């Protein structure tokens, strides 16, 4: 199929979901390009995201749709949705309200390796997860 024919296909038909019906979604800040998180999407969550322009994912642990920010208020307004050349990875460009990470940081990628193989925090703590989600028992 030529690239022009491929572009004429619907976006959803281009996505190659895995055997579990999922596709990885990389989430990037719309203005800075900073990578905020990685999550999984199924067809329903992708359709919802396209329709609402707010990020919705599939929670593998809870086995249900997860509207980002529904508990914390840290919503992701979607500006662009891109697909990679193989059709098996989605890129969402978003405006992040508050922190993207459930442990309170702006990005889930808040730790970096140092030369001595230890780690350091390289991001901003945006909120206290115990205050937002409650204490875990």
UniProtKB/Swiss-Prot annotation:
GO molecular function, one term: magnesium ion binding
Cross-referenced Pfam families: PRA-CH
CC per GO annotation: cytoplasm
Cofactor binding, per record: Binds 1 Mg(2+) ion per subunit.
Residues noted as binding Mg(2+) in the record, renumbered to the chain: 84, 86, 88
Record: residues binding Zn(2+): 85, 101, 108
Signal peptide: none
Domain of life: Bacteria
Cofactor dependency: Mg(2+); Zn(2+)
Catalytic reaction equation(s): 1-(5-phospho-beta-D-ribosyl)-5'-AMP + H2O = 1-(5-phospho-beta-D-ribosyl)-5-[(5-phospho-beta-D-ribosylamino)methylideneamino]imidazole-4-carboxamide
Pathway note: Amino-acid biosynthesis; L-histidine biosynthesis; L-histidine from 5-phospho-alpha-D-ribose 1-diphosphate: step 3/9
Any one biological process term the GO annotation gives: L-histidine biosynthetic process
Subcellular location: Cytoplasm
UniProtKB keywords: Amino-acid biosynthesis, Cytoplasm, Histidine biosynthesis, Hydrolase, Magnesium, Metal-binding, Zinc
Family, similarity comment: Belongs to the PRA-CH family.
Purpose of the protein: Catalyzes the hydrolysis of the adenine ring of phosphoribosyl-AMP.
Quaternary state and interactors: Homodimer.
PANTHER family: HISTIDINE BIOSYNTHESIS BIFUNCTIONAL PROTEIN, HISTIDINE BIOSYNTHESIS BIFUNCTIONAL PROTEIN HIS7
Stated name of the protein: Phosphoribosyl-AMP cyclohydrolase
Gene field: hisI
């Amino acid at each position: 199929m030529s690239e022009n024919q491929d572009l004429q296909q619907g976006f959803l038909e281009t996505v190659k979901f895995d055997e579990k019906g999922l596709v990885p979604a990389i989430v990037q800040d719309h203005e800075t390009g900073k990578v905020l998180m990685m999550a999984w999407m199924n067809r329903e969550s992708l359709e919802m995201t396209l329709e609402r322009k707010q990020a919705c994912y599939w929670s593998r642990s809870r086995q249900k749709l997860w509207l980002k920010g529904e508990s914390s208020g840290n919503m992701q307004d979607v500006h662009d949705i891109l697909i990679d050349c193989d059709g098996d990875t989605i890129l969402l460009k978003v405006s992040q309200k508050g922190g993207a990470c459930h442990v309170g940081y702006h990005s889930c990628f808040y730790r970096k390796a140092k030369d001595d193989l230890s780690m350091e925090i390289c991001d901003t703590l945006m909120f206290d997860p115990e205050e937002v989600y409650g204490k875990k028992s």
